[in-house]
Amino acid sequence: MDLQDRVTDLESRLAFQDDTIETLNDILVTQQRAVERLQLQMTALLKRQEEMGGQFETSEEEAPPPHY
């Protein structure tokens, strides 16, 4: 393999690697946006759960149900 063939091969590999890096970067950006949306949803759900938490708690002072 002469020098020109080696250079051509390296240029081809470099172009392929550049394309792969760009594709991976696009995927990473998409996943990061999805993670950020999920974090916002989780925060909203936790806040909602805290707000609703007092509605379903039973008091220890309540009398037992009639079938006791």
From Swiss-Prot:
Cited Pfam families: SlyX
Similarity annotation: Belongs to the SlyX family.
Protein's name in the database: Protein SlyX homolog
Record organism: Pseudomonas fluorescens (strain SBW25)
